[in-house]
Each structure stands twice: as structure tokens, then as C-alpha cells.
């Protein structure tokens, strides 16, 4: 019986404490197992016994709507488009994580018993990474090349990740920021294992007219006026409310468009997993009650998927405090949407995108009421909402000009 089932026997008022310590104890046993088997596991390095044409195995939480899940889906899709031999394995249910729609062509964890040794790219952070690692059959994990694909959002990685790194032949990361964090954390003889492999998000090849028609169609489907100026942001409470920082988006929107300039402007806040931090839901609902231009969209219930969400928008505004990569930023920009975002440690391919507009920031100490980022000495950005509001207002003014005309540079 797993610790997630035992909780039913625990009195309700003690369950939060039970979960806190049960997870710590379980993770401690996993770390101990790594210590005990470390010599056996690392002895296989350089002895990858598989044919050079063996298919790459991409492992991840494919049915999860999270950024880590999307990273696995993007890699699998890119390899297929490049006509590489590749298999995909969804481990969402194997790890007891919430998931959604199963993807056609993706195997489940039972496939590990039949798959032959190969290059295995695992899109999971610790502690999920090592939990899955020991679910691999010994023959598979000891004769394969194991690559961890990690994402992290702070300059300092948790110290325990160093132990997990010993199980990997290589570590891939989506950005220079995550590479910087990993290099600081890892022992010197492991640093050479780190490679920056950005997510591949296809860029639209539609003309401006086709983009306009797509926007018009999306707005018609969901009841939005085609002449409205619509700003949007999408985030998950499970990705930490204070890091995603949607309140700053509200403030910047309201500064850009005061109440006497009410007509035809809307702010769509698309969120997921509100149950993770109910206090955050109350904060958003209070703001929406005071300003009916703010529309809250619960992604767990709404029929508006991410592609339609981007197509509805004039501007995607992310005033996050930190991002390991920022998949939604590049997805929006590559669909032809203007993106206003915090300029701190942007991934190069995002920073260089013609549709991305950076705003200024200052560094502050991490303050996370959800207690996810318990890393001593960590910092993140405090985005300048005045700068964001000015650039948002300028984009609005430009949207009213004849096509192709611009005001003064936004940078």
C-alpha cells in the first residue's frame, strides 16, 4: 500500500503533516538506494551495449499538461519530423501524477519490459527521475545511455540533485539559465555532461492576412468581439503562483488602460490546478470582481485549448519572476502573437524572436508562500510593471495604425 493510499487512515486535520513527512521519508529511501547501488549503476558508463541504429526512447509525462510534459511531446514530435527512429513512453500514471488525454502512438510504462537498450531521454526532474530510473529493468538501464532532461527555475538547484546526476550519462537542459544552475550545483567532473538543447517549437508560415482570419475565427467560436484588444496569460498554480506572478499582469493591464478607457480591452487569465493553492484563486477572483474586463478561464474545465487561446490574443503578457525556458512565450510568439515578458535570463531563441518585447526588472529574494522553492539564498526577478504597461499601451496604439506602421521603438 502506497503512502498516498494510507492517508485515508489519517485524521483529516493531520493529513497535511502526514503528506509533508511521508514524502520526505520516501525520498530519503530513494536517495539511500542511489547511494547503495551507485557503484553498480555508474560502472556501466561507456559500455552502452546497443546497436547504433537503435531507436531513441523519449520518456516523459506525455499526458500531463505541464511544461515538462510539453517538453517531452515537443522532442518526440521533432524527432518524428526529422524521420529518426524514436519511441515514446508515457509514465504519468506510473508516477501517480494527474494526466489528461492519451496520445496516439505513445506507449505506457509496460513497454519497458520489452524495449531493448538504447539512448533514453528522460524528461523528469528529481525526485521523479530517480523513482522512474529504478522502475527500468536492470538490463535496460545498465546497457542504455541515460540522458536526463531537466528544467529548473532558480539560479540555485537543490543540493540533492547532485546525487541524482550520478545516475545519468548526460544532462540536457532547455536554456543557458538552467545550464548555469546545473554547473554551479554539480561536481567538476560532471560539468562536461551538460548540454543546452532548446525546445523546438515550429514557427507559423501563415501570412498576416491568414493570421488575421485565424484570429477572427477563434474569437467567433468563443464569443469574443473581433475588434477587441485582448491581452492574455496562461499559467498553472502547480508551477507556483508567486513565480508565475499573474497579479503583476493585472496591475500592468490596469495601468495601461485606466477605467475611463474601458471600451474594447480585455484581459484573459487562463489558469490550471487552482485546487493546489486556493488562496491564489481568491486573489484572482477579487481582482476580477473589481474589474469586469478581467476574465478568468479555468483550463481544467474550459474547452479553449492553448492554440485557440493564442489565436484569440493581440498580446501574450508574462511577467514571471523566473522561467527555466518559457514554452508558452515561444509558442505565442511563433503563432504571430506579440509577447511582453520579463527580460531576466530569457532563453536565447526567445529573446531573439521578433515578436518578443522584453521589460526591465530588478532582483529580489525568493518569496514563495507555497513552499516549493525552499532553496537558501535564491533570487528571482521583480518585473517593472510600469515598463510593461507603457509597452502594452504602445502595442495597443500600434494596433490602431494602418498595417505595417509603428510608433517609436519599444526597446
PLM features: what roles do these ranges have?
Residues 43-44, 57-59, 95-183:
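Extended catalytic core of nucleotide-activated donor transferases of GT-like folds
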Residues 57-60, 225-244, 250-254:
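Conserved donor-binding/catalytic core segment of Leloir-type glycosyltransferases
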Residues 107, 207-224:
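A short helix/loop element that forms part of the nucleotide-sugar donor recognition site in Leloir-type
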Residues 278-307:
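Nucleotide-activated donor-binding/catalytic signature segment of Leloir-type glycosyltransferases, i.e.
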Residues 321:
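Aromatic "clamp/platform" in nucleotide-sugar-dependent glycosyltransferases that forms part
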Residues 338-341, 357-358:
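Short hydrophobic beta-strand element within catalytic cores of glycosyltransferases
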Amino acid at each position: 500500500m502506497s503512502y498516498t493510499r494510507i492517508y485515508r487512515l489519517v485524521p483529516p486535520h493531520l493529513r497535511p503533516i502526514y503528506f509533508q513527512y511521508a514524502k520526505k521519508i520516501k525520498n530519503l529511501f530513494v536517495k539511500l538506494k542511489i547511494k547503495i547501488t551507485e557503484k553498480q549503476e555508474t560502472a556501466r558508463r561507456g559500455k552502452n551495449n546497443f546497436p547504433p541504429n537503435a531507436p531513441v526512447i523519449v520518456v516523459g509525462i506525455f499526458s500531463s499538461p505541464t511544461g515538462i510534459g510539453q517538453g517531452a511531446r515537443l522532442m518526440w514530435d521533432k524527432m518524428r519530423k526529422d524521420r529518426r527512429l524514436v519511441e515514446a513512453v508515457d509514465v504519468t500514471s506510473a508516477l501517480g501524477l494527474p494526466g489528461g488525454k492519451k496520445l496516439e502512438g505513445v506507449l505506457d510504462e509496460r513497454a519497458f519490459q520489452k524495449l531493448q537498450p538504447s539512448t533514453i531521454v528522460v524528461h523528469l526532474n528529481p525526485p521523479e527521475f530517480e523513482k522512474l530510473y529504478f522502475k527500468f529493468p536492470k538490463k535496460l538501464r545498465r546497457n542504455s545511455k541515460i540522458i536526463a532532461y531537466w528544467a529548473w527555475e532558480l539560479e540555485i538547484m537543490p543540493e540533492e540533485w547532485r546525487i541524482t546526476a550520478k545516475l545519468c550519462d548526460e544532462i540536457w537542459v532547455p536554456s543557458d539559465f538552467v545550464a548555469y544552475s546545473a554547473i554551479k550545483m554539480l561536481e567538476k567532473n560532471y560539468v562536461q555532461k551538460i548540454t543546452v538543447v532548446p525546445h523546438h517549437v515550429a514557427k507559423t508560415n501563415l501570412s498576416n492576412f491568414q493570421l488575421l482570419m485565424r484570429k477572427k475565427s477563434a474569437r467567433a467560436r468563443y464569443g469574443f468581439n473581433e475588434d477587441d484588444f485582448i491581452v492574455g496569460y496562461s499559467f498553472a498554480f502547480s508551477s507556483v503562483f508567486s513565480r508565475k506572478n499573474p497579479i503583476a499582469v493585472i496591475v500592468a493591464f490596469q495601468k495601461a488602460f485606466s477605467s475611463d478607457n474601458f471600451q474594447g480591452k480585455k484581459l484573459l487569465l487562463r489558469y490550471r490546478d487552482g485546487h493546489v493553492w486556493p488562496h491564489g484563486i481568491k486573489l484572482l477572483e477579487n481582482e476580477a470582481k473589481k474589474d469586469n474586463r478581467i476574465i478568468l478561464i479555468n483550463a481544467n474545465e474550459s474547452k479553449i485549448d492553448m492554440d485557440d487561446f493564442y489565436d484569440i490574443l493581440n498580446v501574450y503578457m508574462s511577467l514571471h519572476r523566473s522561467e527555466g525556458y518559457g514554452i508558452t512565450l515561444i509558442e505565442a510568439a511563433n503563432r504571430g502573437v506579440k509577447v511582453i515578458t520579463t527580460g531576466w535570463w530569457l532563453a536565447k531563441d526567445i529573446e531573439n524572436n521578433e515578436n518578443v518585447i522584453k521589460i526591465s526588472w530588478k532582483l529580489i529574494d525568493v518569496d514563495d508562500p507555497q513552499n516549493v522553492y525552499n532553496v537558501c539564498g535564491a533570487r528571482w526577478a521583480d518585473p517593472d510593471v510600469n515598463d510593461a504597461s507603457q509597452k502594452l499601451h504602445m502595442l495597443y496604439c500600434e494596433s490602431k495604425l494602418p498595417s505595417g506602421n509603428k510608433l517609436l521603438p519599444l526597446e
